[in-house]
């Protein structure tokens, strides 16, 4: 059957069956898609027309929406007006004369455009204008039943059979439209690029179109859900990003290794392989993309990825622990911490035990544990020593305070003893000096109880003083005491001197007349002496009671003895 004639015949039948006589070109192409998919063997062997440039008479504000049996939807809504999918279909209609004019010129390219565009494009089905549900299938079914294979196997197969790509695309496998360059964006946000503003969905081609897609929270969630690993139909254990060490979910809104702009979510291999409209191809041997950092240097078990280095260092540490213990024991012995190396090995102290265990550690974790124990035990021992020193200082302080108290009480007791001793000495002095002061030494009346050394009478050169008188024989006698022939006849010279006599000197006239001059001068001698006040008062009182010159002489002798005893 002639293909062009079949297309024109079906197109004319569709136009006649339309209720209003006007149908959009997408409905015609969708009908042709259903007819052609039932009989794929009628298409000729020449498939070079599949790689030609697509030219469609759609306007800049149109949007394509199609559905295939059992598969997801692919929609590119316009950013100029936020309309629903049904309104977008109506907005893409053309007039009846235009449909008739283009119906005669439809060729194999339009047929491929309708058929391959539904099965080969991989787009993020997200309504950016309405912000509705993205409609991305979490686990797209493997409805066509094609066997899943790895990327490397498919690449080798495609390199061996270059014509197989066209066959895969005709049969519904994902393949990018080939034969021409990508059209530039004509509208805002790439809405008028005839569905090419979305990311390419080919798993065989490495080309990435740098078209911007405005990100949104729903779009990011959709990309994250798509990047999750999906379980295969064979019932194998599903692989998650946590158990696969070579994959990492790329961060959003950042430049990745492919150089995509920040506004575009990064496209991963899962996005090309497990698209909403294409059968998911399980990739078993997945390599991380070039330019991206490996996810983790340590796997899930928590150990580093270089077990050889750790085992070597562990063996080396086991071999060296004996020598390390010997060196440590030698060092402690040389520093004077311990007496001998045997004491370090046999000591039961916590610090020494942890030190030996740290030196015998097989790995870093055990060594860290033992070093921590060593530090804590040393801190505990130092804290204990600090407490002991505090207790010792407290005891020393208490003893010092007790010593101060004892010294204070001793000093007070010593003062009391000194005062008592001085009083005893004064009493003894009175007994020895005053006792036995009589003319006859043989009298038994007032014999001294303590015999002291006898005093030697010393003659003192006394300076002449008119207010002073002496009863001893002096070379120069003062005028107050004058020897004359009448003196022996006077019984009481003190009381009889008040009479004015020519024998009186001129110095006696200068003294007050209320008191006798001799008594006044004697009282001055007593008061000017270094005796105590009580003694002075007693001597003055006894002197005033004297009746004769002998009594006055005896009193003055006692005064002179006391003065000499104090001065000597």
Swiss-Prot record:
Localization, UniProt: Host cytoplasm
Region described as Disordered: spans on this chain: 1-23, 38-320, 496-516
Start and end residues of each stretch annotated as Interaction with the nucleocapsid (N-RNA): 479-568
CDD domains: MEV_P-protein-C_like
Classification via InterPro entries: Paramyxo_PProtein_C, PProtein_oligomer_dom1, RNA_pol_Pprot-P_XD_paramyxovir
Protein known as: Phosphoprotein
GO MF annotation list: disordered domain specific binding; RNA binding; RNA-directed RNA polymerase activity
Region listing for Multimerization, in residue ranges: 344-411
Record PTM: Phosphorylated by PKC/PRKCZ, and other unknown kinases. Phosphorylation is necessary for viral transcription and replication. The N-terminus contains the majority of phosphorylated sites. Ser-249 is the major site of phosphorylation, but is not necessary for most functions.
Gene3D superfamilies (UniProt xref): 1.10.287.340, DNA helicase RuvA subunit, C-terminal domain, Viral phosphoprotein oligmorisation site domain
Cellular component aspect of the GO annotation: host cell cytoplasm; protein-containing complex
Basic and acidic residues compositional bias, start-end: 7-20, 83-101, 150-168
Gene name of this polypeptide: P/V/C
Note: The P/V/C gene has two overlapping open reading frames. One encodes the P/V/W proteins and the other the C/Y proteins.
Domain remark in the UniProt entry: The N-terminus consists of a long intrinsically disordered tail. The central part contains the coiled-coil multimerization domain (PMD). Forms a four-stranded coiled coil structure. The C-terminus constitutes the alpha-helical domain that binds to the nucleocapsid (N-RNA complex).
Functional description taken from the UniProt entry: Essential cofactor of the RNA polymerase L that plays a central role in the transcription and replication by forming the polymerase complex with RNA polymerase L and recruiting L to the genomic N-RNA template for RNA synthesis. Also plays a central role in the encapsidation of nascent RNA chains by forming the encapsidation complex with the nucleocapsid protein N (N-P complex). Acts as a chaperone for newly synthesized free N protein, so-called N0, allowing encapsidation of nascent RNA chains during replication.
Outcome, altering residue 449 to A: Complete loss of phosphorylation
Subunit structure: Homotetramer. Interacts (via multimerization domain) with polymerase L; this interaction forms the polymerase complex. Interacts (via N-terminus) with N0; this interaction allows P to chaperon N0 before encapsidation and form the N-P complex. Interacts (via C-terminus) with N-RNA template; this interaction positions the polymerase on the template.
Family: Belongs to the respirovirus P protein family.
Coiled coil segments of this chain: 364-429
Biased composition (Polar residues): 50-59, 191-206
GO annotation terms (biological process): DNA-templated transcription; negative stranded viral RNA replication
Source species taxonomy: Viruses, Riboviria, Orthornavirae, Negarnaviricota, Haploviricotina
Consequence of changing residue 260 to A: Complete loss of phosphorylation
Domain of life: Viruses
Residues recorded with modification Phosphoserine: 68, 125, 192, 249, 257, 260, 447, 449
Region described as N0 binding: spans on this chain: 33-41
Location of region: L protein binding: 412-445
């Amino acid at each position: 059957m002639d293909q062009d004639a079949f297309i024109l015949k079906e197109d004319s039948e569709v136009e006649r069956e339309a209720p209003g006589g006007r149908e959009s070109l997408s409905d015609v192409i969708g009908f042709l898609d259903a007819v052609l998919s039932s009989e794929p063997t009628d298409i000729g062997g020449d498939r070079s027309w599949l790689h030609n440039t697509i030219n469609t008479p759609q306007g800049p504000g149109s949007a394509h929406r199609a559905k295939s049996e059992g598969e997801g939807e692919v929609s590119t809504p316009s950013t100029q007006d936020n309309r629903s999918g049904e309104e977008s279909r109506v907005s893409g209609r053309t007039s009846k004369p235009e449909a008739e004019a283009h119906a005669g010129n439809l060729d194999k390219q339009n047929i491929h455009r309708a058929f391959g565009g539904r099965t080969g494009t991989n787009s993020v089905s997200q309504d950016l204008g309405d912000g509705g549900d993205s409609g991305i299938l979490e686990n797209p079914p493997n409805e066509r039943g094609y066997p899943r294979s790895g990327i490397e196997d498919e690449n080798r197969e495609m390199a061996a059979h270059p014509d197989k790509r066209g066959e895969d695309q005709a049969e519904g496998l994902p393949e990018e439209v080939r034969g021409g360059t990508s059209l530039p964006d004509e509208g805002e946000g790439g809405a008028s690029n005839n569905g090419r503003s979305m990311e390419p969905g080919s798993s065989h081609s490495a080309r990435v179109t740098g078209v911007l897609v405005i990100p949104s929270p729903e779009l990011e969630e959709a990309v994250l859900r798509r990047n999750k690993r999906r379980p295969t139909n064979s019932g194998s254990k599903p692989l998650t990003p946590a158990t696969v060490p070579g994959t990492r979910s790329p961060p959003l809104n950042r430049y990745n290794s492919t150089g995509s702009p920040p506004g575009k979510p990064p496209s991963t291999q899962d996005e090309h392989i497990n698209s909403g409209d294409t059968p998911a191809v399980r990739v078993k041997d997945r390599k991380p993309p070039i330019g991206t950092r490996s996810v983790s240097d340590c796997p899930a078990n928590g150990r580093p990825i270089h077990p050889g280095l750790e085992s070597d260092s562990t063996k080396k540490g086991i071999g060296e622990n004996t020598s390390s213990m010997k060196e440590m024991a030698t060092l402690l012995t040389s520093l004077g911490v311990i007496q001998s190396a045997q004491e370090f090995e046999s000591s039961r102290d916590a610090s020494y035990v942890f030190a030996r265990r740290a030196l015998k550690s097989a790995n870093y974790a055990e060594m860290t544990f033992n070093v921590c124990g060593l530090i804590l035990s040393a801190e505990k021992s130092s804290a204990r020593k600090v407490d002991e020193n505090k207790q010792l200082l407290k005891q020393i302080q208490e003893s010092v305070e007790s010593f101060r108290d004892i010294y204070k009480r001793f000093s007070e007791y010593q003062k009391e003893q000194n005062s008592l001793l001085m009083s005893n000495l004064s009493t003894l002095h009175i007994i020895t000096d005053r006792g036995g002061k009589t003319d006859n030494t043989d009298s038994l009346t007032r014999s001294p109880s303590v015999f002291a050394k006898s005093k030697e009478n010393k003659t003192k050169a006394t300076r002449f003083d008119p207010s002073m008188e002496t009863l001893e024989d002096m070379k120069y006698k003062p005028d107050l005491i004058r020897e004359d022939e009448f003196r022996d006849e006077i019984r009481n010279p003190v009381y009889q001197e008040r009479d004015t006599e020519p024998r009186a000197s001129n110095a006696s006239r200068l003294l007050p007349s209320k008191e006798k001059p001799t008594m006044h001068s004697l009282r001055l001698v007593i008061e000017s002496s270094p005796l105590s006040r009580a003694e002075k008062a007693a001597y003055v009182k006894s002197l005033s009671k004297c009746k004769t010159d002998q009594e006055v002489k005896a009193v003055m002798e006692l005064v002179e003895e006391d003065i000499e005893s104090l001065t000597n």
